[in-house]
Amino acid sequence: MAAPPLSSWPWASLGSYKYVLYGAVVWKVAEEWRQQGAAPVGSWWLHLLLLFAARGLTYQFWFSYGNMLFFTRRRRVVPDSVDFRQVDAEWDWDNFLLLQTLIGATLVGSPAVARQQLLLPSLKQAWDPRGWAIALLLHVLVAEPLFYWAHRALHRAPLFSRYHAAHHHASVTTPLTAGFGTPLESLLLTVVIGVPLAGAFLMGVGSVGLVYGHVLLFDFLRSMGYSNVEVISPRVFQAVPLLRYLIYTPTYLSLHHREKDSNFCLFMPIFDLLGGTLNHKSWELQKEVYLGKNDQAPDFVFLAHVVDIMASMHVPFVLRSCSSTPFANHFVLLPFWPVAFGFMLLMWCCSKTFLVSSYRLRGNLHQMWTVPRYGFQYFIPAAKKGINEQIELAILRADRMGVKVLSLAALNKNEALNGGGTLFVNKHPELRVRVVHGNTLTAAVILNEIPSNVKDVFLTGATSKLGRAIALYLCRKKIRVLMLTLSSERFLKIQREAPAEFQQYLVQVTKYQPAQNCKTWLVGKWLSPREQRWAPAGTHFHQFVVPPIIGFRRDCTYGKLAAMRLPKDVQGLGYCEYTMERGVVHACHAGGVVHFLEGWEHHEVGAIDVDRIDVVWKAALKHGLTPA
């Protein structure tokens, strides 16, 4: 069955190449620039491009603000987060901007428009208050009622299923949801936004300022309404009750998206009042949201840290197209590197642990908090005390909030930093929150990746917390472990922990040469390309080193960092954890999740209990976590 007309975008198959359609406008600007020998500031073609950029930034501003959970968590209308399904559905949210820019280009390039001089003379006038008055009048008397009745029509069969249902695909709105729709809906919005402008220009009182001001204010109000964050104080409506019928709120719009039978207006609820579709609980709910009554304490917290400056931009409140895919050095982020560097310095001076993302699992709220420190700072001796203070404050805050389990990420549990979390547990024995390093499950993931027919392995980082546990576990399986370490004292200490009959399977090596015939390398310490050359062809590098080693050898294979896929019933997950694939988290994160789901009452800090590796692994599988 053929799709209904105006229900799909003609450039849908182009993907990101759709932006080539701006080429004609760019060419016009370049041509005028060449002819004038300077920037064509009086060109409508240039203004079309500038307006497109300004509109995109408006939506991005509200999107970023709405996803800064450390600012907005308490005033979110719907507390849940956006999931990957919604991210993908709204991927081409800016189609309406492209459509309206092309319509504008058609008008600017139209011989009839040029001949009647409807647009071009207005460039000489940046501001005309009469035009603003006319535009406001036409917006209230024409645009608002037109949108209201058209919107109500779109909610009736068969128009809803054909054209509008996709826009209501999720109850959690974002500013990008505002732009997500069919061509028919976008054409309707084009008429609604264009009527006041057309009226002002036809009356000869249009101006450049009116175009920018009206369009950007329109986008600003739509973005605000879809932001899912309540920004208008209820005191404003209490002081001036009439205002509640003149301006909508994010709560007002959210009710429409969830219930679908009320609150149809564009910006002015008075039209819902006149049309009998006003949801009367809008302002009471708005008050509750603004006062933070929707707020909920998390049940589980994963305490992460920033890896580096580029990775600091891989967060939900920067670019969703980047944060919803595994981290990579996207060229589009390079111009923002100086800004990110400035924020690094700012956080170093005066920031504290903050909330980055959240999801739900079986009715429980899981959050990721981030210590405002970057990877390199963990190796500065003078920074050690400050980092531990940040982690300690986060643990105490979680304890006050009633968090059940807090899991430490990567460098936050560094042995030299705080003994794998023992520092905090010993200092605060009365803690109710369980502190977990998650390394038991990390070890289990690495060990279960090793083929069952392997007879010997080469282990770097052999005397680390993970290296020790892996070596002791493998020797019990009668697998020979070549432990690379220069410290005989550390090696012997680990060897003595093994049962006497298995100690022979632990072998100390001080160089890479003994591993020339071993095809299973367990990498817990960084390997340079030169060191990797000692591995024979066909070697597989299993990794538990941060950051992961560079895949230098083409005749070898490289495993990823230990990770697990969250259960299928996870909700509100729309963010990729560093280089992990969608739905996959680091094993130490997963270890904390398992600890919480099992309801274990002990802290998991310090040395790894080798006897619990299989216990934790089986518990993870039981709860639906799977190897990534």
Swiss-Prot record:
Catalytic reaction annotation: a long-chain fatty aldehyde + 2 NADPH + O2 + H(+) = a long-chain alkane + formate + 2 NADP(+) + H2O
Phenotypic effect of disruption: Early leaf-rolling at the reproductive stage. Reduced wax accumulation (lower total proportions of aldehydes, fatty acids, alkanes and alcohol) in leaf cuticle leading to an increased cuticular permeability (e.g. chlorophyll leaching) and a subsequent altered drought resistance due to rapid water loss.
Membrane topology, as annotated: Multi-pass membrane protein
Keyword Lyase carried by entry: yes
Domain Fatty acid hydroxylase stretches: 137-277
Keyword NADP: yes
Primary localization: endoplasmic reticulum
E.C. number(s) listed in UniProt: 4.1.99.5
Upregulation: Induced by drought and abscisic acid (ABA).
GO biological process, one term: alkane biosynthetic process
Cellular component terms per the entry's GO annotation: endoplasmic reticulum membrane
GO molecular function: aldehyde oxygenase (deformylating) activity; iron ion binding; oxidoreductase activity
Membrane-traversing stretches: 37-57, 131-151, 191-211, 299-319, 331-351
Distribution of this protein across tissues and organs: Expressed in germinating seeds, radicals and leaves.
Free-text function comment from the UniProt entry: Aldehyde decarbonylase involved in the conversion of aldehydes to alkanes. Core component of a very-long-chain alkane synthesis complex. Required for the formation of wax layers conferring cuticular permeability and drought tolerance.
Family in the record: Belongs to the sterol desaturase family.
Protein name, per record: Very-long-chain aldehyde decarbonylase GL1-2
Organism of this sequence: Oryza sativa subsp. japonica (Rice)
Organism lineage string: Eukaryota, Viridiplantae, Streptophyta, Embryophyta, Tracheophyta
